């Protein structure tokens, strides 16, 4: 079982501020599952407009955080790293459900499990909780592809 700090996460994801949405990996079992943490701060840039006076993390960014967790799990499973030639792209989402909003001060716990992989396409289930309460769940697909330049 692996853990990854932010320095290791930066090696496994091509994302950078403001779109790096994983702060820490607290459990990774390659080929099986991953648990990650995203600390939500009032300083997140999306809170300026979503919504003034009532800051709520956009649902699409909650899903993006799940997708980033699946990318880390896929790279750890294949023992590869993102490169200028190829990365994992967010390829699809099914059965996305949102149960409650996420705001400043929340710590999201992202749990993803590998359902199956076939060639370059990977399918995962994912769930997000805050303080043990379900925030969102979805099936996420990612695809290992050559980068588009």
From Swiss-Prot:
Gene3D superfamilies found in the cross-reference section: Hotdog Thioesterase
GO biological processes: fatty acid biosynthetic process; lipid A biosynthetic process
Pfam families: FabA
Annotated EC: 4.2.1.59
EC class name: lyase
Stored InterPro entries: FabA_FabZ (IPR013114), FabZ (IPR010084), HotDog_dom_sf (IPR029069)
The reaction(s) this protein catalyses: a (3R)-hydroxyacyl-[ACP] = a (2E)-enoyl-[ACP] + H2O
Localization in the cell: Cytoplasm
A GO molecular-function descriptor: (3R)-hydroxyacyl-[acyl-carrier-protein] dehydratase activity
Cellular component aspect of the GO annotation: cytoplasm; membrane
UniProt keywords, alphabetically: Cytoplasm, Lipid A biosynthesis, Lipid biosynthesis, Lipid metabolism, Lyase
Metal-binding recorded as keyword: no
Domain of life: Bacteria
Family: Belongs to the thioester dehydratase family. FabZ subfamily.
Job of this protein: Involved in unsaturated fatty acids biosynthesis. Catalyzes the dehydration of short chain beta-hydroxyacyl-ACPs and long chain saturated and unsaturated beta-hydroxyacyl-ACPs.
Protein name: 3-hydroxyacyl-[acyl-carrier-protein] dehydratase FabZ
Biological source species: Nitrosococcus oceani (strain ATCC 19707 / BCRC 17464 / JCM 30415 / NCIMB 11848 / C-107)
Gene (UniProt): fabZ
């Amino acid at each position: 079982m692996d853990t990854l700090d932010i320095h290791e996460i930066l090696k496994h994801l091509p994302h950078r501020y403001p779109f790096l949405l994983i702060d820490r990996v607290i459990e990774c079992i390659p080929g099986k599952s991953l648990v990650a943490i995203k600390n939500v701060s009032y300083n997140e840039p999306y809170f300026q407009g979503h919504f003034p006076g009532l800051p709520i993390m956009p649902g699409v960014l909650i899903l993006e955080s799940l997708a980033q967790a699946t990318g880390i799990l896929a790279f750890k499973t294949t023992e590869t790293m993102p490169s200028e030639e190829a990365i994992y792209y967010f390829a699809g989402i099914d059965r996305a459900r949102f149960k409650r909003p996420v705001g400043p001060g929340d710590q999201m716990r992202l749990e993803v499990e590998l359902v199956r992989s076939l060639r370059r396409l990977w399918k995962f289930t994912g769930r997000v909780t805050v303080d043990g309460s379900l925030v969102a769940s979805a099936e996420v697909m990612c695809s290992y592809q050559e980068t588009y330049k």
